[in-house]
Amino acid sequence: MKSRLLTVFALTFSIISPATATPNYTVGGDRPVTVNLPDTLANPAPLLILLHSASTSGAHQENYMHLGPVAKKNGLIYIAPDGMINPEGKRFWNASKSCCNRYKQEVDDVDYINSLIDEISKKTPVDPKRIYLIGHSNGAFMSFTFACKTNKVAAIVAIAGAMDTESDCTPSTPVSLLNIHGTADKTIKVTGGVMNNFPYTSATKTVKTIASVNKCSNLATSKKDFEPTIKGTETTVINYACNTHTHLQFWKIANGSHSPKLPTDFAEQVISFLLKQSK
């Protein structure tokens, strides 16, 4: 009788206990990055890649955006890799002529990100139709470049980024985009500018470039309170209607800075946008 009770208890405990999380692992060779896996891993599962701003790191960017817990809860494989280190000891992505390889170092970050995707895909079932990028500043430039040079990206969230004016950005397949930019950004100006002696696009031109690829038009405009330190509904949301399966939005933050204060539900907002997108 006692053994029977122990058996029943063991079965009951196994039913009510949560499943053991799949252990994280490292990829990337001499530029290692931790692959963060969700507790429940779909087959296949979406992959989220966070690309940091110049002079920071993947860990710093995660500390700013707090994507990890929300990615984990929503079944996303998640990585926040680091760019190369320049002679000043600062990290960067070799995204374009204007941003931000100041010392013209020989580094192919498109190849590096590709290699991360390939290495992860060999170990974990990545859904090739749901690969997402979130980039800030230099990381946003890198997100656009990677999407333009490969056909792997389903959607991008870009904060305070742009493209080279002379860029021939023509993704072979449509890419969904949520573009966020503050009008008071003094680093990457919303109206466009010059860095490293090369011009970069305005936020409007950046969005129009993707809109052309996605065959979008028929703008609808609304307001929202996004930046918590600016009073009122400071953010204009420009929503495009696209003739493809993609979605395109431009959130323009009135008086928003280069690194705007993010709302507490920022991760939920952007991951919700991404998870609606597929190639």
PLM region descriptions:
Residues 176-180, 213-279:
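C-terminal catalytic histidine-bearing segment of alpha/beta-hydrolase fold enzymes
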